């Protein structure tokens, strides 16, 4: 072997057909990846919302306890 990569000769029509099919497969893979990322984002957003709600609820409760203890 003289260090060169082997060359293959393909008809241009066949090559273009294969490239179109690869583009379609690539589009499908990108679509699925984006759907998965969107679902993960929704789950993370829900979890963050629950945490913020808990923290705000706890702060409101502590403020209520502080204020109610001042008037006793």
Curated annotation (Swiss-Prot):
It is a single-pass membrane protein. Keywords: Cell membrane, Membrane, Methanogenesis, Methyltransferase, One-carbon metabolism, Transferase, Translocase, Transmembrane, Transmembrane helix. It is found in: Cell membrane. The keyword Mitochondrion does not apply. GO terms for molecular function: tetrahydromethanopterin S-methyltransferase activity. The chain crosses the membrane at residues 48-68. It comes from the Archaea. GO terms for biological process: methanogenesis, from carbon dioxide; methylation; one-carbon metabolic process. Pathway: One-carbon metabolism; methanogenesis from CO(2); methyl-coenzyme M from 5,10-methylene-5,6,7,8-tetrahydromethanopterin: step 2/2. The keyword Lyase does not apply. One of its GO terms (cellular component) is plasma membrane. It catalyses: 5-methyl-5,6,7,8-tetrahydromethanopterin + coenzyme M + 2 Na(+)(in) = 5,6,7,8-tetrahydromethanopterin + methyl-coenzyme M + 2 Na(+)(out). InterPro entries: THM_MeTrfase_su_G (IPR005866). Its EC number is 7.2.1.4. The complex is composed of 8 subunits; MtrA, MtrB, MtrC, MtrD, MtrE, MtrF, MtrG and MtrH. Belongs to the MtrG family. Part of a complex that catalyzes the formation of methyl-coenzyme M and tetrahydromethanopterin from coenzyme M and methyl-tetrahydromethanopterin. This is an energy-conserving, sodium-ion translocating step. This is Tetrahydromethanopterin S-methyltransferase subunit G. It comes from Methanosarcina mazei (strain ATCC BAA-159 / DSM 3647 / Goe1 / Go1 / JCM 11833 / OCM 88). The lineage of its organism: Archaea, Methanobacteriati, Methanobacteriota, Stenosarchaea group, Methanomicrobia.
């Amino acid at each position: 072997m003289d260090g060169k990569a082997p060359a293959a000769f393909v008809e241009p029509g066949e090559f273009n057909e294969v490239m179109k099919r690869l583009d379609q497969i690539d589009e499908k893979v990108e679509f699925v990846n984006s759907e998965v990322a969107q679902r993960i984002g929704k789950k993370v957003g829900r979890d963050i919302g629950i945490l913020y709600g808990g923290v705000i609820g706890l702060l409101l409760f502590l403020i209520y306890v502080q204020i109610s203890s001042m008037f006793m």
